């Protein structure tokens, strides 16, 4: 099982209790925060990118929604050409986005991280955003 592999490799414990599963969950969460921090730091410096939600890493999960003045479709295509995969749209949150003043026709760009995302993937994303915005 995947959690057993993570536990064996990183923690050297057997997953026999909820506390050991919690340790693996904490390990995953910690890695996701490490990956997310450079992006949040970058976004803080960009006045033309609106981050939906907090810049504080402790207040976030590793999914980031941004709004820019550029067309999301165009930006997503440009990032995809750099082998950076992003999503665009409303992600079934139409009323929330409307309440936040987001143009529903444009929606948001969604950037998702998981614990096995590499640091170089994050660097490539930041470089692409910096290049195209």
Where are each of the predicted segments found?
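Pyridoxal 5′-phosphate
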Residues: 1-133
